[in-house]
Amino acid sequence: MSQALTLARPYGRAAFAIAREGGNFAPWSDALAFSAQVAGDPRVAALLLNPALGQEQAVTLLAPPQAGEDYLRFLGVLADAQRLSLLPEVAGLYEHLRAEAEHVVKATVTSAAAMSQTELDTIAAALKKRFGRDVDITTAVDASLIGGAVIDTGDVVIDGSLKGKLARLQSSLAH
């Protein structure tokens, strides 16, 4: 596990605990996604390392306009600990904890071409049956897959792509 994830874990858990206590999962998701995107920009990352940038300025830079007091205090804690650069990891950990709490599996379905809603509904039903949880599907298109799809739930990857099948066939023929 990367050092960044290790360092971000307590902050992700803290953000989740605060959001759960207030019943504000969605606003915290939105705020963390905003802050993570801003902090992930290389120019902003360099600015955050500048000692001339004050803590209040950093919090103002990274906070979304609709941020509540709890979220601003949370960013202040990160700024005090010089951990604002970990916001992308904190956001990812928060989303994982939220999905667990809401009994939702987040899946990314990458296909060679755009999929119809019927196909996505079939995949969602199969994943719900397999995991026993509701499924939140995000789609992506990657023409290099040639055909089929790759389903990634974080812990489980199902490669039903033609590219993957050809790679497995090549590997078995080589041995």
UniProtKB/Swiss-Prot annotation:
<dbReference type="InterPro" id="IPR000711">
    <property type="entry name" value="ATPase_OSCP/dsu"/>
</dbReference>
<keyword id="KW-0375">Hydrogen ion transport</keyword>
<dbReference type="GO" id="GO:0005886">
    <property type="term" value="C:plasma membrane"/>
</dbReference>
<keyword id="KW-0813">Transport</keyword>
<dbReference type="InterPro" id="IPR026015">
    <property type="entry name" value="ATP_synth_OSCP/delta_N_sf"/>
</dbReference>
<comment type="function">
    <text>F(1)F(0) ATP synthase produces ATP from ADP in the presence of a proton or sodium gradient. F-type ATPases consist of two structural domains, F(1) containing the extramembraneous catalytic core and F(0) containing the membrane proton channel, linked together by a central stalk and a peripheral stalk. During catalysis, ATP synthesis in the catalytic domain of F(1) is coupled via a rotary mechanism of the central stalk subunits to proton translocation.</text>
</comment>
<comment type="similarity">
    <text>Belongs to the ATPase delta chain family.</text>
</comment>
<keyword id="KW-0139">CF(1)</keyword>
<dbReference type="Pfam" id="PF00213">
    <property type="entry name" value="OSCP"/>
</dbReference>
<keyword id="KW-0406">Ion transport</keyword>
<comment type="subunit">
    <text>F-type ATPases have 2 components, F(1) - the catalytic core - and F(0) - the membrane proton channel. F(1) has five subunits: alpha(3), beta(3), gamma(1), delta(1), epsilon(1). F(0) has three main subunits: a(1), b(2) and c(10-14). The alpha and beta chains form an alternating ring which encloses part of the gamma chain. F(1) is attached to F(0) by a central stalk formed by the gamma and epsilon chains, while a peripheral stalk is formed by the delta and b chains.</text>
</comment>
<dbReference type="GO" id="GO:0046933">
    <property type="term" value="F:proton-transporting ATP synthase activity, rotational mechanism"/>
</dbReference>
<protein>
    <recommendedName>
        <fullName>ATP synthase subunit delta</fullName>
    </recommendedName>
</protein>
<keyword id="KW-0066">ATP synthesis</keyword>
<keyword id="KW-1003">Cell membrane</keyword>
<keyword id="KW-0997">Cell inner membrane</keyword>
<keyword id="KW-0472">Membrane</keyword>
<comment type="function">
    <text>This protein is part of the stalk that links CF(0) to CF(1). It either transmits conformational changes from CF(0) to CF(1) or is implicated in proton conduction.</text>
</comment>
<dbReference type="GO" id="GO:0045259">
    <property type="term" value="C:proton-transporting ATP synthase complex"/>
</dbReference>
